[in-house]
């Protein structure tokens, strides 16, 4: 009932907005023509304010005419652009009714070469509310997955191939084209691994999202913008590549775009064929016993995926669109672990445990669909409505053997077989409304999401003649979660000052239902929760000088547990170590404040403080009265994080440019595993990333990049040693109109990207070290194709700009 009341109140509120938003509207009109006096349709019309920020965009109609209706008084500039023509920029004028008459655009020479490469952007661009890493401009971010390309983004670090961090803090919300994935943890990483980097235009790292976006993400938000061509006609790209590290890998991606009049159709297909290898060791002393192990892990899964969609302009005000994404990961896998077991105070080995996991069946299938409707009129009113549906089907079958030997003689065998299936069903509805109000911009909206995760685990002891079910480890778990959200947000410019304030309400209803057998009878364990949270956000900025600005932002954030972390199933890694979820896990809540200075769109200096309650992390913990170690998530206490960051773009000369990103951060954990084990740990750490681009003779471009991480505190009480990586890439464009691009890249030249960490408390010591296949040689070729009828792109910047603003 509470949710219904909230929805009715807000819908009633929407109906009254227009009464408050009627202000004095001024009309700007004109007609755009070419040198032959013919009308230019689909020219992009932009109105810029005194800070040179776009406040209104539209396109000319079939007669080349445009009309802007705007109500916020001030000084403005009119900018008109069209592919194949020189840009027109008016003199500064006060907002009033005004006709610009005929505006003639002078033509500029244009061929396919210019269509492909025009508007060249820096590798890293700095915007007031975001740092943008332009993946399509990077030499060594091509021919890999989105997951691998994300490692190159400034401020981003992926810890031990499983946790994405931003500016030294975990809890990052990932969006794709401004839309939430509804996935986290291993499922999100699988999704990123199935996306080719060639389909990505840029990563946008957003430090302080407004109330318009989900409150998830204590560290901020990363929006992945996919490529979508603006060229009329049929065009696309084909990328093929070979990667070699320990084994050979083959990468293939093809994408196309067809644009004609009001219709745009796009699609893509990609696959990754090859094995991935990992090597990791551990050295553990637990209750006086030594466990020294070495693991070789081979992931034999293949990746395949595709996308198809369309956008259709019904008229100048109404647009509809839809797309379908399919991602598949399938194949086998093998881990082989040798563990020497002995006494912690000597080098004498009592036993050797040889464990093998044969993942003879693995699959991950994800289908996601979206339907979008957009209305935008000349009064500044925008309506967006999204319907999302997705399914996530994951399953694996594993045969595990544990063979114990004493003095090279087999003393015991434990053989297991497990079947695990996860089916996740995701539904989402979202409504956003924007209008001019009191010489500012008012935004409000509603969102509803429904998640159902069905999990089925079967565990068997393999005997000589049959498999015997292990009731203790065989169970089903169903998790349902429904979130209803509503928000309001207002932003306004007052001379040199800009303010933004918002409030988001999210009500979460969830229940976990565990079914298992105990003494031959079925048992149930329910974990219901219902909670409502309010998430205020506020920012204020001032344009201190012509070239610099200063801003202060605050927001409250939430990080709900991932679905695997809530799943109480037991997953055996071997006889002496296993993973288990925690259905009692609570969301962690974070207060976050950021002070930021921006200079000339080339420098950002930031100072951020975050305070997290109910801090949660995965911990390694010894099981009492046994020699088994368990890896599980727990709510631990409080984490405080303060960070200082610097991002600097620099053009040294006409052939050398560089981008630097550095973060120094201090983490303080006041946490407890239980009432007897408390930790009060503090660690100062640094991360630096330098990327350099060189223009060389013979149409060559070189890229040299390096990343360094100092000693740091990760998770609750795990201290990791420093590591680093250097990559080098070479690129050359050739064929007619530079349609072909050939790249040669060497990643992690000296194999410095290895992990090495230690954690300890009384009676327990654990050291982990190893590496994934980071050192690789990659060769890939990209070919761009287009039909010969290209006259220039149909400008859809108004729609794209609004999607872009959704990530700010």
Tell what function each PLM region has:
Residues 247-275, 279, 289-335, 365-367, ...:
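Transmembrane beta-barrel wall of Gram-negative outer-membrane proteins
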Residues 305-329, 356-515, 543, 547, ...:
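Face-selective signature of the C-terminal outer-membrane beta-barrel domain
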Residues 33, 44-48, 81-85, 99-139, ...:
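Short, acidic, small-residue-rich periplasmic hinge/interaction motif at the N-terminus
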């Amino acid at each position: 009932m509470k949710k219904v009341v909230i929805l009715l109140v807000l819908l009633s509120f929407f109906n009254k907005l227009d009464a408050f938003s009627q202000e004095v509207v001024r009309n700007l009109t004109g007609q755009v023509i070419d040198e032959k006096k013919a009308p230019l349709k689909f020219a992009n019309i932009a109105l810029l304010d005194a800070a040179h920020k776009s406040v209104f965009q539209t396109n000319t109609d079939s007669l080349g005419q445009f009309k802007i209706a705007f109500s916020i008084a001030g000084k403005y500039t009119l900018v008109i652009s069209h592919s194949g023509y020189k840009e027109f920029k008016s003199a500064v004028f006060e907002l009033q009714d005004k006709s610009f008459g005929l505006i003639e655009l002078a033509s500029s020479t244009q061929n396919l070469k210019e269509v492909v490469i025009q508007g060249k952007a820096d590798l890293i661009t700095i915007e007031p509310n975001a740092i943008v890493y332009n993946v399509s401009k990077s030499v060594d971010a091509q021919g890999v997955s989105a997951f691998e390309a994300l490692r190159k983004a400034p401020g981003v670090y992926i810890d031990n191939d499983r946790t994405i961090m931003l500016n030294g803090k975990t809890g990052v919300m990932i969006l794709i084209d401004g839309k939430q994935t509804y996935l986290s943890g291993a499922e999100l990483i699988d999704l990123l691994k199935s996306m080719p980097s060639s389909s990505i235009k840029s990563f946008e790292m957003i430090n302080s999202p407004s109330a318009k976006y989900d409150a998830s993400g204590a560290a901020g938000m990363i929006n992945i913008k996919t490529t979508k061509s603006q060229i009329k006609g049929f065009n696309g790209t084909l990328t093929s590549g070979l990667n070699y590290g320990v084994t050979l890998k083959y990468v293939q991606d093809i994408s196309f775009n067809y644009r004609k009049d009001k219709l745009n159709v796009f699609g893509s297909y990609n696959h990754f064929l090859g094995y991935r290898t990992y090597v990791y060791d551990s050295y553990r002393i637990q209750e006086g016993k030594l466990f020294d192990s070495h693991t070789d892990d081979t992931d034999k899964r293949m990746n395949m995926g595709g996308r198809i969609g369309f956008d259709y302009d019904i008229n100048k005000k109404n647009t509809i669109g839809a797309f379908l994404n399919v991602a598949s990961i399938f194949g086998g896998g093998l881990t082989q672990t040798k563990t020497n077991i002995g006494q912690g105070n000597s080098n004498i080995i009592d036993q050797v445990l040889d464990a093998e996991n044969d993942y003879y069946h693995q699959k991950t299938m994800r289908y996601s669909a979206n339907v979008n409707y957009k209305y935008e009129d000349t009064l500044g009113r925008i309506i967006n409505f999204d319907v999302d549906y997705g399914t996530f089907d994951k399953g694996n079958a594993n045969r595990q053997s544990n063979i114990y030997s004493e003095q090279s003689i087999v003393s015991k065998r434990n053989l297991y077989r497990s079947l695990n299936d996860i089916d996740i069903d995701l539904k989402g509805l979202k409504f956003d409304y924007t209008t001019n109000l009191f010489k500012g911009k008012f935004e409000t909206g509603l969102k509803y999401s429904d998640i159902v995760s069905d999990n089925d685990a079967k565990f068997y002891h393999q005997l000589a003649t049959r498999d015997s079910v292990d009731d203790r480890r065989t169970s089903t778990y169903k998790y349902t979660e429904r979130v209803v959200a509503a928000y309001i947000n207002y932003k306004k410019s007052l001379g040199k000052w800009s303010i933004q304030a918002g409030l988001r309400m999210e009500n979460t209803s969830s229940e976990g239902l565990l079914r298992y057998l105990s003494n031959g009878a079925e048992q149930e364990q329910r974990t219901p929760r219902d909670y409502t949270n309010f998430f205020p956000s506020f920012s204020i900025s001032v344009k201190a000088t012509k070239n610099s600005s200063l801003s202060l932002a605050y927001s409250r954030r939430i990080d709900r547990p991932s679905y695997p972390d809530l799943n109480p199933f037991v997953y055996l890694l071997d006889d002496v170590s296993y993973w288990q979820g925690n259905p009692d896990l609570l969301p962690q809540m974070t207060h976050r404040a950021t002070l930021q200075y921006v200079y000339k769109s080339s420098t950002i200096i930031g100072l951020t403080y975050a305070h997290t309650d109910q801090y949660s992390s995965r911990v390694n913990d010894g099981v009492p009265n046994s020699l088994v170690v368990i890896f599980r998530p727990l709510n631990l206490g409080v984490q405080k994080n303060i960070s200082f960051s610097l991002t600097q773009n620099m053009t040294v000369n006409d052939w050398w440019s560089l981008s630097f990103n550095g973060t120094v951060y201090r983490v303080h954990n006041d946490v407890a595993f239980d009432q007897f084990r408390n930790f009060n740990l503090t660690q100062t750490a640094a991360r630096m990333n330098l990327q350099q681009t060189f223009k060389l003779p013979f149409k060559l471009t070189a890229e040299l990049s390096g990343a360094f991480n100092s000693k740091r505190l990760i998770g609750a009480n795990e201290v990791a040693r420093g590591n680093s990586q250097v990559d080098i890439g070479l690129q050359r464009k050739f064929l007619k109109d530079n349609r072909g691009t050939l790249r040669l890249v060497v990643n992690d030249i000296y194999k410095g990207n290895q992990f090495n960490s230690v954690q300890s408390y009384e009676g327990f010591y654990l050291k982990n070290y190893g590496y994934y296949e980071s050192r690789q040689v990659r060769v890939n070729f990209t070919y761009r194709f287009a039909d010969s009828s290209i006259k220039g792109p149909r400008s859809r910047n108004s729609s794209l700009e609004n999607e872009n603003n959704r990530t700010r």
